[in-house]
């Protein structure tokens, strides 16, 4: 799958792009997607504008509804929030970025976690993809 990266974060993000290339390399998908790296202020603005929630979050996905377009959609990842969560969960920042990207990707495909069954299905798929990329907990 083709992934296009856009860095709107204050630091270099090439190392995360390399990791995500490994994560998504074996996924057979005809459509591309965009991953945009942002900070907490930027994702807070996006969260407020589109979800009416005035606080930062870790990842937000926007599926592309235009069937003529060859893009699944856009995934915004807050590097600031990923750093906090990696410390909280006791794993690497690389693993957290991978998790957030896969989580966002599955949302673009229509997966969700509103019910216990949906959450189990989504999180099982996430772990399978991350384990293949050797980003285990």
Swiss-Prot record:
One Pfam assignment: YbeY
EC class name: hydrolase
SUPFAM superfamilies xref list: Metalloproteases ('zincins'), catalytic domain
A molecular function GO annotation: zinc ion binding
InterPro entries: MetalPrtase_cat_dom_sf_prd, YbeY, YbeY_CS
Cofactor field: Zn(2+)
Localization per record: Cytoplasm
Gene3D superfamilies: Metalloproteases ('zincins'), catalytic domain (3.40.390.30)
Enzyme Commission number: 3.1.-.-
One GO cellular component, as annotated: cytoplasm
Swiss-Prot/TrEMBL GO biological process terms: rRNA processing
NCBIfam families: rRNA maturation RNase YbeY
Descriptive protein name: Endoribonuclease YbeY
Organism field: Acholeplasma laidlawii (strain PG-8A)
């Amino acid at each position: 799958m083709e992934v296009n990266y856009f860095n709107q974060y204050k630091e270099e993000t090439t190392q995360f792009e390399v990791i995500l290339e490994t994560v998504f390399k074996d996924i057979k998908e005809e459509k591309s997607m965009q991953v945009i790296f942002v900070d907490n202020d930027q994702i807070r603005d996006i969260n407020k504008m589109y979800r009416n929630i005035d606080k930062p979050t870790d990842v937000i996905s926007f599926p592309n509804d235009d069937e003529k377009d060859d893009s699944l959609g856009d995934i915004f990842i807050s590097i600031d929030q990923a750093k906090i969560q990696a410390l909280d969960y006791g794993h690497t920042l690389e693993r957290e970025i991978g998790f957030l990207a896969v989580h966002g990707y599955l949302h673009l495909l229509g997966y969700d976690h509103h019910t216990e069954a949906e959450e189990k299905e989504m999180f099982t798929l996430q772990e399978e993809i991350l384990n293949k990329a050797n980003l285990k907990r």
